[in-house]
Each structure stands twice: as structure tokens, then as C-alpha cells.
Amino acid sequence: MFGFNKFLDWFSEIADRWDTKGVKFTLYTTIAVVIGGLFELIPPFFLTKTVTPISTVKPYSALELAGRDTYQREGCIGCHTQMVRPFKWEVDRFDPTKAYGRTGYSKGGEYVYDHPFLWGSKRTGPDLAHESQMLRSDEWHKNHLINPRTVGGVPNSIMPAYPWLFEDSHKIDVEQVVSNMKALKAIGVPYTEEDFANAPSLLKDKTEGQALVAYLQKLGKDSAELQKGMK
């Protein structure tokens, strides 16, 4: 106890001494904060990547990217997550076919080309990170988007219907998609000039609904391909 009191007396003496040297104390504190801040802020500028891409993961095609834009615009992220957490019950639910082997949860490398990522935080509807492995056809997805209450076995579903996405009045804006691809290339997504040149033919006469279906069928597909190659 005596030793502790002695320490407090010493500390109090030091504090009193610095109280009389406010300018110097402020200067030293500022220097310490700046040095600490530099150690925190400078290293990230030299990091080209923080996650190693999964070898089978490829950038979205023009049609899939258009569908992703529609997904964001319609607010799907407000009700669906895109990240399977590393819990057994969650993996069992969202990887029923065991397409991802023993580790069926989401990996960082699956999202390297997502700008922004669409993990979400609310599951009013199911997680969609591995939707491609639910083995649902394009026709199933189309009918589900047109009327969620007649497809999927949930007659009281609160999911909105999106029939207009498949109408001719909602054709894909080709120029906008190509512009988006070029912007993504500028931040590191490996699109090529060939991708830009082929986009108009891939998107010709396609509706936003068709694009959204293509996007849903892409989710989790590439990372599942890696597991197939390991079998």
C-alpha cells in the first residue's frame, strides 16, 4: 500500500509539473498523435489488395451487371442478405446440396469484384449469396419475380411483385451498362475492350427482369465451380 501511495505522489508531481508547461505539453501530445496516425494511415495506401480472389470467380457479365444494378435500384438489399455466416444451421439451410464442401459459408474472395458489396443486414427474405446452387430454373425466378405468392410455396409472402421488369418498356440501357463496366475497370475489375465491344449484342432486346434473373443465377456460381474442380 505504501508503495502505491508513493507512486501516486510521484505521478501527481509529474502532472503538476506539466500543468505549468501547457504549450510544451500540447506540442508533445500533437507530435505523438501525428506519429501514431501516420503508422495507422500510411500502410493502407501501399496495399493493392487485402483479399486474395478465388481463382474461379469472374467479373459479372454485362447482363449480370445490369441485373445487379436493378437489384440495387429496387431495394432488394433491404430484405435479402448476401453473406452466409459460419454457423452450421445457416450453412445447412443455404447450401443444401453441399456445393461448397465442408465450408459452405461465404468467403471474402467471393466479393472481390463487388462494388459496392451487397451483404445487407436484414433477412426478411432468405439469404441469396449462394442462390445459384438452389437449383432453380430461369423460368422459376421469372415467375417468382412476377408473382412471389404463386411460386416458392409461400402464399402469404410479403415480397413485392415486379411484373413490369419483364415488359418491353423496361429494356436495358446498354450505354449505361457499358459506362458502368468502364468505371469498374478503373477501380480494378478486369474487364477488357472485348467485354465492352460485346456488351451491346449481349444486352440487345433484353429486359431488366431478364438481367435480374441472370444476376441471381450468378450468385455463388463461381465459388461452387472451385469446389467441383477439387472433387
At which residue positions do the language-model features occur?
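Post-cleavage N-terminal segment of exported redox proteins
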Residues: M1-Y60, E110, L184-Y191, Y215-K231
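Electron-transfer interface patches adjacent to heme c in soluble/periplasmic c-type cytochromes
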Residues: T29-T30, V34, D92-E208
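Electrostatic cytochrome c docking/interface patches
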Residues: T48-Q72, V84-F94, A99-R102, T124-P126, ...
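The canonical Cys-X-X-Cys-His
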Residues: G67, R73-Q82, L212, L216
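Bilobed periplasmic-binding protein/Venus flytrap-like ligand-binding cleft at the lobe interface
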Residues: Y71, N143-P148, L212-L219
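Surface-exposed patches in mature extracellular/periplasmic domains of secreted proteins
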Residues: C79-T81, G153-A161, S223-K231
